[in-house]
């Protein structure tokens, strides 16, 4: 990219984080900022399958990573104990709604479970942090910009990190909703604009896992554009 006019190179270093050395280029002639090409935040990895196992606990485990990164000492198990829950299935045959609480069992050790969406996760995060922001509904570029600013982002995706076709319709107390057992939650930790990849801490045990940018953005959209971040 050819920049016309005076250019100021601003180098910001955060211990433990990898940032492209030409991190921000400010073009004084037109006031535009050229975004960082690559960012990888050093977010602590928490594995939902480590003891005590949370077979269905990707959402609370990913939230624990975000909170830990921001200096908040909380475990996945504590979050699992404190997340609002709803039954997997009521006596009348209706299912719980993940917008109201975690559907079923978070641990998955004794009964079925599905997952939970951004609303209950936001409420849970507010119990531990003052500065919690719900980006739900924002386009994916906005999410990436928050990571660029140094904030790991909790989000809902799929186990394929791409759109899926295995949705089914559930009757809930709030009406019909479409759900998928492929629903997954991760912590977005970085990106590479040249390689067109997103980096995530996957609570299945993968730190800074590299996934395709376009596929991940499409899954983000399919799953309702759900995202939350925290600041100190």
Please place each PLM-identified region on the residue numbering.
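Active-site-adjacent structural segments surrounding the nucleophilic cysteine of cysteine proteases
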Residues: 1-119, 159-161, 166-170, 179
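Stable alpha-helical elements in mature extracytoplasmic
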Residues: 54, 58-63, 75, 79, ...
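Envelope-exposed proteins and targeting segments
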Residues: 54, 151, 182-184, 196
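Structured segments of extracytoplasmic/periplasmic soluble domains
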Residues: 61-73, 82-89, 124-131, 145-150, ...
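Active-site-proximal beta-strand/loop segments in catalytic clefts of secreted hydrolases
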Residues: 63, 82-83, 137-138, 156-160, ...
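Predominantly the structural core of cysteine protease catalytic domains
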Residues: 96-182, 191, 230-231
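Noncatalytic regulatory segments and standalone regulatory/sensor domains
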Residues: 169-180, 189-232
């Amino acid at each position: 990219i050819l920049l016309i006019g005076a250019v100021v190179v601003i180098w910001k270093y955060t211990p433990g984080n990898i940032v492209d050395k030409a991190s921000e280029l400010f073009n004084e002639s037109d006031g535009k900022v050229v975004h960082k090409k690559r960012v990888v935040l050093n977010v602590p990895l928490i594995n939902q399958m480590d003891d005590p196992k949370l077979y269905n606990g990707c959402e609370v485990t990913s939230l624990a990573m975000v909170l830990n990164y921001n200096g908040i000492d909380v475990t996945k198990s504590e979050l699992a104990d404190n997340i609002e829950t709803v039954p997997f299935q009521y006596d009348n045959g209706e299912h719980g709604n993940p917008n109201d609480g975690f559907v079923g069992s978070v641990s998955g050790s004794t009964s079925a479970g599905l997952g939970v969406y951004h609303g209950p996760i936001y409420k849970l995060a507010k119990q531990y942090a003052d500065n919690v922001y719900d980006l739900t509904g924002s386009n994916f570029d906005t999410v990436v910009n928050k990571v660029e600013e140094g904030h790991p982002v909790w989000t809902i995706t799929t186990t394929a990190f791409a759109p899926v076709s295995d949705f089914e319709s559930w009757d809930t107390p709030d009406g019909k909703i479409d759900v998928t057992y492929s629903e997954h939650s991760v912590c977005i930790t970085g990106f590479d604009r040249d390689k067109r990849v997103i980096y995530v801490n996957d609570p299945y045990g993968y730190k800074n896992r590299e996934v395709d940018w376009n596929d991940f953005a499409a899954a983000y959209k399919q799953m309702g554009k759900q995202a939350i971040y925290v600041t100190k």
